Amino acid sequence: MNQATQIIPFTTSGSLVDYVDRKVIVVLRDGKKLIGILRSFDQFANLMLQYTIERIYVDDMYGDIDRGVYIVRGENVVLLGELDLDKEYDAVKQLRRMPAEELYPLAKLHEEEKKKNIREKGKYLHSVGFSVDGGHDDLY
């Protein structure tokens, strides 16, 4: 194998093999953040996570919802990365843990405010001659 072929990055779903049996974070198109152990995947990057939690962040607070075994359709994945357990602990200890039931309404409120701001910004940009793209679920 020559050096040129070694430089080309491996970007297909096969590159996920290094993450199997490791703790990963998955960010979905709708903004959900899932943390769990990647157990399996297929050629379409459909994922199976075990011991999954859905983590909700609001300001300096976070809450976890246990989801157990979770199957994610590959087209909904925006980001997938391995978690460094030490760094995760250091990052989370700076936040206040709250019950997810209390945070969920706050998260919905923040999401609605964000959508409203995006709509207002889009209207303004359109009024000064810019083209505004994006659909109702185009969050990335």
UniProtKB/Swiss-Prot annotation:
Signal peptide: none
InterPro entries per record: Lsm1, LSM_dom_sf, PTHR15588, Sm, Sm_dom_euk/arc
Domain of life: Eukaryota
SMART domains associated with the record: Sm
Keyword rRNA processing: no
Sm domain sequence ranges: 11-86
GO molecular function, one term: mRNA 3'-UTR AU-rich region binding
Subcellular location: Nucleus; Cytoplasm; Cytoplasm, P-body
GO cellular component: cytoplasm; cytosol; Lsm1-7-Pat1 complex; nucleus; P-body; ribonucleoprotein complex
Keyword RNA-binding appears in the UniProt entry: yes
Keywords assigned: Cytoplasm, mRNA processing, mRNA splicing, Nucleus, Ribonucleoprotein, RNA-binding
Main location: nucleus
GO terms under biological process: deadenylation-dependent decapping of nuclear-transcribed mRNA; mRNA processing; RNA splicing
Region annotated Confers RNA-binding specificity, chain positions: 129-140
Disulfide bond positions: none
Entries under Pfam families matching the protein: LSM
Function: Component of the cytoplasmic LSM1-LSM7 complex which is involved in mRNA degradation by activating the decapping step. The LSM1-LSM7 complex loads onto the 3'-end of single stranded RNA.
PANTHER family tied to this protein: LSM1 (PTHR15588), U6 SNRNA-ASSOCIATED SM-LIKE PROTEIN LSM1 (PTHR15588:SF8)
Summary of subunit composition and partner proteins: Component of the heptameric LSM1-LSM7 complex that forms a seven-membered ring structure with a donut shape. The LSm subunits are arranged in the order lsm1, lsm2, lsm3, lsm6, lsm5, lsm7 and lsm4.
Family according to the record: Belongs to the snRNP Sm proteins family.
Protein's recorded name: LSM1-LSM7 complex subunit lsm1
Native source organism of the sequence: Schizosaccharomyces pombe (strain 972 / ATCC 24843) (Fission yeast)
